[in-house]
Amino acid sequence: MFMKRILYIIIIIIFSVNTFAQNKSMTDTVYSIQEVEILGASKKKVEIGKLNVPLQYLPMSVSTVSYKDLEIRGISNIEDAVKFLPGVRMNTSYGAFQTLYVRGMTYTPIMIDGVRDERTMINSYPFSDLTNVESMELLKGPASVLYGHSVLGGVLNIVRKSPTPQTVVNMKMSYGSWNNKQANMDFGGNLAGPLNYRVNFNYGDQDGWRATGNKRLSGYLALGADIDATSRIDVRGSFHRDWYGTETGLPPVMMADVYNTDGTLYLKAGQEIPGLNEKKRYNNESDFLKNNGWDISGKYEKKFSKSMKLTNYLSYKYDDINYLGTEELSYLYNMNSVYKHYIDKGTYKMYINLDSVQLTYPLRFSHIAKTLGNQLELSGDFYTGNIKHNFLGGYSFSQMFRNSYTGYNNAPENDKFNSEYDIYGPGIYSVIAVNNPLSMGYMKSKFSKAIITKDYTHGIYFQDLIEFHEKFKFLLAARYDIYKYLRTGANTYGGIRKYHKSEQTPYSIATNSAFTYRAGMVFIPISELSIYTSAASYFRPSRTFPAANTIYLNKNGSDIDIESGKGIFHPETGYQFEAGTRYTYKSILQASASVFYIRKNDIVRSFGRLSVGSDANGNPVMKSIIGQVGSEESKGFDIEVAITPTHFSSFNLGYSYTDTKTLDIQPNKYVNIDTQNITLVPHNTFYAYGNIVVPKGVFSGLSYNLSISFMDKVYTNYAKSMSFSSYWLTDMGISYPLKNGIRLSGNVNNVFDKTYSNQAVYGTQRVPGMPRNFMLSLAYSLR
């Protein structure tokens, strides 16, 4: 096995990719301190309050992957794209809800064109396709503090395609395994005078490996113009209409040792029922997830001189999630020996039926989020004596109004057809066979409660990159954030997403504010090498109010009295350090390495839904457990290397080691917390990808691409009753240009047909990863 892995890596080194024109050289590239895009890599430039200095002047770690590298591999989903960023893991749950982990830290914010998506700070959310994206850029470590509260470990910036004066015509149609169909159109050019544009449309439809039947539709328009020699305006808008079949996974692993009736051990705790068909789907026929949304933004730039610029960025985003999902699969229990297996409870035996599962906890909710944001920034440079200062000062404002509608009042099992309840019908509490699951009928649903929340954030910030000497640069930055969170509730009417404002309860209000800092230094002994270090503080406001069927724990492990009327949790605080180096040799070699340490205090963690007792029939009573469990630290290092041995080949690899632990944990009566590992965080991640293009001859333009990724073992719950085993995945593709701008390509993913999993429901219901699959594409480009 080890020799196979070495062989894979050697193959990539031999067959490595990207034409010379596509390679991103860092030697003389100008970077923005709040942008990650390498300007020399494209015809356009995304600026986010930029400081025009070379990358080697900046004490920060940057990782980049271009959409071109993703497109030739047939990747348009964010969870597949981030595997080419070191120390990153995207956790997907219920089929489409996604949470980004960077350097062991969860709820990493995601930005679109430099503007934070405030939704990603509080919940997992679906993300639409990446076909309108130019590049993805990860800013890691203390540099991420530039983007406001709750940023720790890193921040991911998704840079969309910009208006272009050059004519662009790209069309692509693809067909793949499980009836996967995709079509994409990308146009750009000059409309009239100084006005340029970019348009993108994408459609996707598939049966899916596990018959989820996901569908996607998206559109994007960007307009840009130079008003005069000193002013520019850029307007962008997009929409998406996505439908997902949701995912409840396979029957849960055993929460305790299971015995045969003769007393012999059948399954150990954490083991799965043997012989499960990984393609079988256990969801109800009524399950669905709809995600519709649109956004619009405008950016205005005014240059007062070569050394000073004013930028204002106004944005609005609307997002609508509508969800009904079979989440919990439960085994049937009985105190009498009516089943073939049992769990030893010490003083008695609890018999368990492993031949079927019951759909016990369907969930119905909807979130409508409306986010308004604005950034006003002044940047430039000035001198104090012979010392140059590159400064940026700004004010940011964001408001997110989110209405959440819930239908959690499920019909009881003995009255499951009663339409007075939120979820009812023959499908609820239905029992289906483990080996041949078939839907036992529909579920109907409605909403009964509305939760109305309002988030307001004001931030003032300033940073100064001081060129003290040609070999020494210093960076100082400070930020002050004021955060206000309001929450109220009301009953809906008619079972739909409507409520009467006159029936709202009084607002619960949480207000937090904090000062955060950042400091860094860069040493440049030679022009090809820079060494840097930086540090920053961290703040995450508290926004937790009491919820039904939830138990809250304080940092001492005791239950919190939520009737006291006081706030439940304290804000999280913390700090992070980083030291790194960057080396560039001509256009042949680019290498970087960094070590980091992160600590945050008063962390809040969800331990999932756990059994807190039994009802009169012996069935477990389930409640959500949330606790402010103590502190958490993460430490490790990242390495990235890019090699361009010829004009027609290149090689990229990255490795990250992350050790994340909880600290200062007090015991509680509900769950044992192991301080050695945090859930869903791998110790080791690795990627390598490359391509070779035939430069001339009969097969001129023929290209090959190959990529390898490794994900280490991760635990899915704090009890460590289930984990995802480590796995390697290998993908490859080939592409050949035909006449008149037409290109034919094919991709094979999971070449060696590895069995793996990377998501689970409740940490116990494993969702199998896709086996070997194929994609064929026909593309046209106007040259």
What residue spans do the PLM features occupy?
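N-terminal periplasmic "start-of-domain" segments of outer-membrane beta-barrel proteins
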Residues: E37-D69
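Acidic/polar loop-and-plug regions of large Gram-negative outer-membrane beta-barrel proteins
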Residues: G224-D226, T230-K303, Y318-A369, F417-S448, ...
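Conserved C-terminal beta-signal and adjacent last beta-strands/turns
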Residues: L363, H367, S379, F391, ...
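Membrane-embedded beta-barrel scaffold of Gram-negative outer-membrane proteins
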Residues: K303, K309-S315, D319-G325, Y532, ...
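Gram-negative outer-membrane beta-barrel transporters
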Residues: E470, Y597-R599, N617-N717, F752
